[in-house]
């Protein structure tokens, strides 16, 4: 049943991003979805039966693109109550062979992009004194594995951003949380991978938390994952 709330999900692809959009729609929210390639996003949303969800062009590395996406979303559906940053810059390779450009590209999407989206979300929410901002992390948020320096650097930085924003914005009524996805995401049979729909349920629980018991960081993994 609709309850007149607005969610903006940035970094929507066929896995977790689409599952987050679907969950918010099922719960009755007005949802705006953003990704770098608007046409591809529109096709994905239509394939999932999400015809009513606007597809926004949003290059998270470009602050003007992010602000334009937020302006369009807010004009269409009002101030966001929930913003999810789900974009990620993935790169791997030996530190002996990686180029500065590869490292910077991963950081610009995964960390700087989080700043652009988080800042736009905070500016939209602060006047209302309420809202939730969620950042998607990974195992690499906590551990830099061999050959994953660019990804880990971006994810470490995103986690630091989320922590800083949580401490600054919490007293202003805005709930900021970082979610560590500790494992691979997919629809494989059994429990070897985290299922997108199940992760989306966890995000929804964070959004619905009462102010007296906010989670600032959550880590999700399958029951068979070693940690």
Model-derived features: where do they sit?
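Conserved glycine-rich Rossmann-like NAD(P)H-binding loop of the short-chain dehydrogenase/reductase
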Residues: 27-43
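A short, exposed helix-loop element centered on a Lys and neighboring polar residues
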Residues: 118-119, 163
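Conserved glycine-rich cofactor-binding loop
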Residues: 13-14
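C-terminal helical subdomain
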Residues: 171-227
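Substrate-binding pocket helix/loop in short-chain dehydrogenase/reductase
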Residues: 94-95, 102-107
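Catalytic loop of short-chain dehydrogenase/reductase
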Residues: 132-157, 163, 170, 185
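The beta1-alpha1 cofactor-binding region of Rossmann-like NAD(H)/NADP(H)-dependent oxidoreductases
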Residues: 57-69, 100
């Amino acid at each position: 049943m609709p309850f007149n709330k607005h969610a903006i999900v940035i970094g929507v692809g066929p896995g977790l991003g689409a599952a987050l959009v679907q969950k918010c729609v099922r719960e009755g929210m007005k949802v705006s979805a953003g990704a770098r390639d608007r046409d591809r996003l529109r096709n994905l949303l239509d394939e999932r039966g999400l015809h009513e969800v606007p597809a926004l062009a949003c290059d998270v590395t470009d602050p003007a693109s992010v602000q334009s996406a937020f302006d369009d979303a807010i004009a269409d559906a009002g101030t966001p109550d929930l913003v999810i940053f789900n974009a990620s810059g993935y790169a791997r390779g030996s530190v002996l062979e990686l180029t500065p450009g590869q490292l910077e590209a991963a950081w610009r999407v995964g960390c700087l992009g989080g700043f652009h989206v988080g800042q736009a979300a905070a500016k939209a929410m602060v006047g209302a004194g309420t809202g939730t901002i969620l950042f998607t992390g990974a195992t690499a948020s906590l551990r830099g594995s061999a050959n994953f320096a660019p990804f880990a650097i971006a994810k470490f930085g995103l986690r630091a951003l989320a922590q800083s924003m949580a401490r600054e914005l919490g007293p202003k009524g805005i709930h900021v949380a970082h979610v560590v996805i500790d494992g691979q995401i997919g629809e494989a049979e059994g429990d070897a991978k985290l299922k997108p729909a199940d992760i989306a349920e966890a995000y929804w629980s964070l959004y619905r938390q009462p102010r007296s018991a906010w989670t600032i960081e959550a880590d999700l993994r399958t029951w068979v994952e070693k940690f």
